[in-house]
Amino acid sequence: MNKTLVAFASKQEFNTLFPQISAVVAASTPVSVGALYDVTVCGVGVLDFSVNLASQLSKHRYERVIMLGICGAYEGRDIQVGEVVRVDTEVVGDMGVQNAEGHFIPWGELIGEPVIYKGDSPRLLPLRLASVRSVVGVTVNTCTGTRYLSLRRSGMFNADVETMEGAACFAVCKKFGASVFQFRAVSNIATDRDTSAWKIPEALAALKSEVLDNL
């Protein structure tokens, strides 16, 4: 067993980057990739990801967890499709209440203090990874599908990208005392939903060359 665990949410993303390893096997127990790191698949969304990552960390001792995946970038944040970013801070973007006028109020606003989840200092990373662009992420259960929601979420949280597991990964790793980092490759702009414009294979190729090959 290695000291670093590389965690994926999606079996499809994992299969693209590690075609030689069964995603089904990696979802049940971490698989070693030589002497470099172990890999695992924890499931899409905060619930599956947090439960499965917690299960793995309760059985195996890792000093460091690196989460890899794709993400959407919000409009107007000067982030390009295919760009690799390091998500250092996350908030949960759709946890809160709706008031009588139909307006969404974030949970942090309700309790009077922001609820922020953070990764560890990039100074703990190899120089190549420490120099990757740092961004703020929003973890959601329902992905943005309109330009209106994209601008609203990015403005409300001053956020750059949208994920479905980032906050969960940070929270679980902190609980288990493992240092944690999250890298994402932008596959699309989170705006009016148009899957024909998505560049998932290209984003995953960038993730491999810029992150995996530099671990």
Language-model regions: role of each:
Residues S58-E63, F176-A178:
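Glycine-rich phosphate-binding loop signature in dinucleotide/nucleotide-binding domains
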Residues V140-T191:
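A C-terminal functional module that forms or caps the active site or interfaces directly
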Residues V180, A185-L215:
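Regulatory input/activation interfaces that engage signals or partners
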Residues K3-A7, I66, V85:
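Conserved beta-strand elements of the Class I
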Residues E63-V65, D160-V161:
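Conserved acidic residues
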Residues E75-F157:
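Mid-sequence, gly/pro-rich, charge-dense loop/helix-turn segments that line enzyme active sites
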Residues M1-S55, K59-H60:
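N-terminal short beta-loop-beta anion/metal-coordinating cradle
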